[in-house]
Amino acid sequence: MARVKRGVVARARHKKILKQAKGYYGARSRVYRVAFQAVIKAGQYAYRDRRQRKRQFRQLWIARINAAARQNGLSYSKFINGLKKASVEIDRKILADIAVFDKLAFSALVEKAKAALA
C-alpha cells in the first residue's frame, strides 16, 4: 500500500483557520493551535450573541417606550394593555421609533390607550 502524504490537505486546513483568525491579537492570529481554539470560541460567542441580540434590542425598545409613556403619564404595562384594548397592532420596534422621532404621534397613541383603559 502506498504511503499517503497529507501535507497539502493539512496546509489548506491550517490556511483556512489562520485566514479566519486574521486580525486576532498575537499568537491567536499566527499559531495554528491557538488560532483554532480562538476561532472555535469566536464561533460559540457569535452563535450565542445572535440570540442575545434579539433580547437586547427588545429590552432597548421596551425601555424607550416606557420612558416616553411615563412622560405622558402612563406606565409601560398600562400603555401596552391600553393599546391592546384599543386594537392598535404596532410592534415594539415601531413604537420605540415613534417614541424617539415623533413625540406628537406617540402622545396621540398614549391618549388612545388611556381612552381604551377608561
UniProtKB/Swiss-Prot annotation:
Keywords recorded for this protein, A-Z: Ribonucleoprotein, Ribosomal protein, RNA-binding, rRNA-binding
Bridged cysteine pairs (disulfide): none
One GO cellular component, as annotated: ribosome
InterPro entries: Ribosomal_bL20, RIBOSOMAL_L20_CS, Ribosomal_protein_bL20_C
Gene Ontology MF: a single term: rRNA binding
Superkingdom of source: Bacteria
A biological process from GO: ribosomal large subunit assembly
Cross-referenced PROSITE patterns: RIBOSOMAL_L20
Pfam families per UniProt: Ribosomal_L20
Gene3D superfamilies recorded: 6.10.160.10, Ribosomal protein L20
Protein family: Belongs to the bacterial ribosomal protein bL20 family.
Physiological role: Binds directly to 23S ribosomal RNA and is necessary for the in vitro assembly process of the 50S ribosomal subunit. It is not involved in the protein synthesizing functions of that subunit.
Descriptive protein name: Large ribosomal subunit protein bL20
Lineage per the UniProt record: Bacteria, Pseudomonadati, Pseudomonadota, Gammaproteobacteria, Enterobacterales
Gene: rplT
